[in-house]
Regions:
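Multi-pass membrane proteins that catalyze or facilitate reactions on polyprenyl-/lipid-phosphate substrates
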Residues: 1-275
């Protein structure tokens, strides 16, 4: 039962941090140290994948009508606009898809270290503050999804590719990239959510294939609880973020990332010195 309670806590953390631009990895790397599941390291990696699936399903549910090109309630023009959204999502995912397929194992083995996570938390925290200060008072060039051009999409896609570095935050990287080229906060955030669907489903499927599907009854319970909690909390987090950015900028998240990065440095740095 203790692992079930831990799964609930992990699900809450994943649901919040996957969509707010504050790095789910940065939080989970500390959580893993404080609340390690008694199921082995391989299972924990699988658990992380499954709770991510719960998070991405929340986006699918919230935006199902907007992203469904087969809806009988849509006119022919609306269906065409929906297909255009998917085309832009697929193009934006290409850089991350190519790098993920070729270098997934290398990234996990080489870059998944606490000091990389801490550094990326701080770097992108500073970026958020700098970009928001630079854009202050300027009218965004892109205020509608339809105004996103192919070059813009590819630039945002490259930022999503860079988010494969642990601690970067996939949502954080793509939002920063979009803001830098004049995309409004609401369009940048929604596009980030849409980009997550194929990328996270693809990444999750890749890891599920690697780890296999053989679990004990307790492990199945832990996976299901974590996924459901992550799904529910993600719905709340997504709705909160879309409401928050209507009146606020992203600087608060930038400051939070810097503080968390320093905490990660201190937490693991002191452990390393005392070891």
């Amino acid at each position: 039962m203790l692992d079930i309670l831990k799964a609930i806590i992990f699900g809450i953390v994943e649901g919040i941090t996957e969509w707010l631009p504050i790095s789910s990895t940065g939080h989970l790397i500390i959580m893993e140290e404080l609340l390690k599941l008694d199921q082995g390291d391989a299972f924990f990696e699988m658990f992380q994948v499954v709770i991510q699936l719960g998070a991405i399903l929340a986006v699918v549910v919230i935006y199902f009508h907007k992203l469904n090109p087969f809806s009988p309630k849509k006119t022919q023009k609306q269906k065409m606009m929906t297909w255009q959204i998917w085309i832009k999502v697929v193009i934006g995912c290409l850089p991350a898809a190519v790098v993920g397929i070729l270098f997934d194992d290398w990234i996990d083995k080489t870059l998944y270290h606490w000091y990389v996570v801490a550094l990326m938390l701080i770097v992108y925290g500073i970026l958020f503050i700098v970009v928001e200060n630079y854009q202050k008072g300027k009218e965004p060039q892109v205020t509608k999804f339809s105004q996103l051009t192919i070059p813009m999409i590819l630039i945002i896609g490259v930022f999503q590719m860079l988010a494969m570095i642990p601690g970067t935050s996939r949502s954080g990287a793509t939002i920063v990239g979009a803001l830098m080229i004049g995309v409004s906060r609401s369009v940048a955030t929604e596009y980030t959510f849409f980009l997550a669907i194929p990328v996270m489903f693809g990444a999750s499927l890749l890891k599920l294939i690697k780890f296999g599907f053989s679990f004990t009854a307790m492990q199945v319970a832990v996976l299901l609880v974590g996924m459901v909690v992550s799904f529910v909390v993600s719905i709340v987090a997504i709705k909160f973020l879309m409401s928050y950015i209507r009146k606020n900028d992203f600087k608060a998240f930038g400051y939070y990332r810097i503080v968390l990065g320093v905490i990660v440095f201190l937490f693991f740095g002191i452990q390393a010195l005392l070891a």
